[in-house]
């Protein structure tokens, strides 16, 4: 370091700055050669990367599950809330129908209330699952058809957005063709009237 006579720094401050410069120089890559490209993976990380991506994902998943569990209330299980679920009605109708039907058949055939109850509950669960899946597939298919229709309409060319060129001679041509048709119709009517007047109304046998 060049000595400057009018410098305000003391010798102690200069000695303290020299180790700092050495420490800063130690952070620089020592195996660097002139013209060499330094990649990002060769440099030390700027931020602490203690948690991996999988650990962060698990942590976020736990937080999401905790928020979902805390958001559950007893009022969510009311009849009004349950009937507002899209496929709850179809699943309930098919499940209860299967329960009554299978329970009645098993009770009539085996005369055992326990066996009939077991079969009825099993039929309720299976029927509800089948009804729910049928309703879900129908809704999914209808959503796909609606999305396809939206995409088809969006891809269509909108003619009203562009100026359509009009030929000024077209109205005159239409009028001329209309007058010509009118004159031909009148001429044919006159010919028919003349032919009918010239034809005799009596006939010799």
Swiss-Prot record:
The UniProt annotation puts the region (Disordered) at 1-27, 165-205
Q: Where is the composition biased (Polar residues)?
A: 184-196
Per the UniProt record, one Pfam family is Cox20
Q: Which GO terms describe its biological process?
A: mitochondrial cytochrome c oxidase assembly; negative regulation of programmed cell death
UniProt membrane topology term: Multi-pass membrane protein
Keywords, alphabetical:
Membrane, Mitochondrion, Mitochondrion inner membrane, Transit peptide, Transmembrane, Transmembrane helix
Mark the transmembrane ranges.
Answer: 91-109, 116-132
The record's Gene Ontology cellular component field reads: mitochondrial inner membrane; mitochondrion
What molecular function does GO assign, one term? unfolded protein binding
**Coiled-coil segments on the chain, per record:** none
- The residues on the Mitochondrial intermembrane side of the membrane are 133-205
- Where does the record say this protein resides? Mitochondrion inner membrane
Entry superkingdom: Eukaryota
List the disulfide bonds in this chain: none
Q: Which residues lie on this side of the membrane: Mitochondrial matrix?
A: 110-115
What does the function comment of this entry state?
Involved in the assembly of the cytochrome oxidase complex. Required for the maturation and subsequent assembly of the mitochondrially encoded COX2, the precursor of subunit 2 of cytochrome oxidase.
UniProt lists the family membership as follows: Belongs to the COX20 family.
Quaternary data: Interacts with COX2.
- Name of the molecule in the record: Cytochrome c oxidase assembly protein COX20, mitochondrial
Q: Which organism is it from?
A: Saccharomyces cerevisiae (strain ATCC 204508 / S288c) (Baker's yeast)
The taxonomy runs: Eukaryota, Fungi, Dikarya, Ascomycota, Saccharomycotina
């Amino acid at each position: 370091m060049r000595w400057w006579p009018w410098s305000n720094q003391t010798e102690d401050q200069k000695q303290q700055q020299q180790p700092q410069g050495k420490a800063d120089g130690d952070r620089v890559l020592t195996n660097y050669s002139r013209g060499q490209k330094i990649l990002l993976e060769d440099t030390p990380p700027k931020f602490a990367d203690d948690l991996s991506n999988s650990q962060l994902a698990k942590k976020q998943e736990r937080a999401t599950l905790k928020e979902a569990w805390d958001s559950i209330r007893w009022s969510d299980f009311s009849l009004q809330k349950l009937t507002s679920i899209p496929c709850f009605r179809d699943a309930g109708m098919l499940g209860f129908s299967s329960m009554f039907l299978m329970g009645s058949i098993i009770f009539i055939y085996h005369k055992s209330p326990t066996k009939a109850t077991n079969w009825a509950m099993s039929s309720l669960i299976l029927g509800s699952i089948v009804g729910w899946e049928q309703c879900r597939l129908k809704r999914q298919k209808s959503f796909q058809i609606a999305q396809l229709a939206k995409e088809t309409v969006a891809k269509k060319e909108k003619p009203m957005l562009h100026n359509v060129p009009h030929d000024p001679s077209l109205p005159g041509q239409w009028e001329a063709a209309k007058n010509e048709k009118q004159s031909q119709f009148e001429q044919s009517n006159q010919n028919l009237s003349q032919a009918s007047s010239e034809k005799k109304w009596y006939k010799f046998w």
